[in-house]
């Protein structure tokens, strides 16, 4: 039995060779690690952390990843709004820093798993392992979690939602 995040961590430790530049030794940044990185990026970009609060920036990045938006797609979606463009700047730098450090955050466990499950050969291999999927608190799932479950369930779509 897995949570979405624990499944993602296990899956990615086995499949990271299919997602360069990562390898299976990646650390997983918790909320505090992510916030520290965002604070450092705000300093690098000369952005005031009172105007661009790290918690708010972190929530926007998390939301983007939950919608499976990579930094460039996020930037394209937000348009010309000044604040949103600065969030996009931080997101791009944040993503770059994670990759440089072979690190993932909690949202990446869902984001990257869903991306890799979109590759047919990988998806088929994992679909053979799971014949039924039970999702507790289904109403709390985000887009990435929904898509992950749908991809794993495959053609049988044996998903039980509680």
Per-region residue spans from a language model:
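Hydrophobic residues in beta-strands of the RecA-like P-loop NTPase core, especially within AAA+ ATPase
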Residues: 134-141, 162
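Helical "lid/switch" subdomain of P-loop NTPase nucleotide-binding domains
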Residues: 126, 137, 144-148
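A basic/glycine-biased coupling hinge at the interface between accessory DNA-binding modules
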Residues: 1-132, 156-159
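Conserved protein kinase catalytic core
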Residues: 9, 142-143
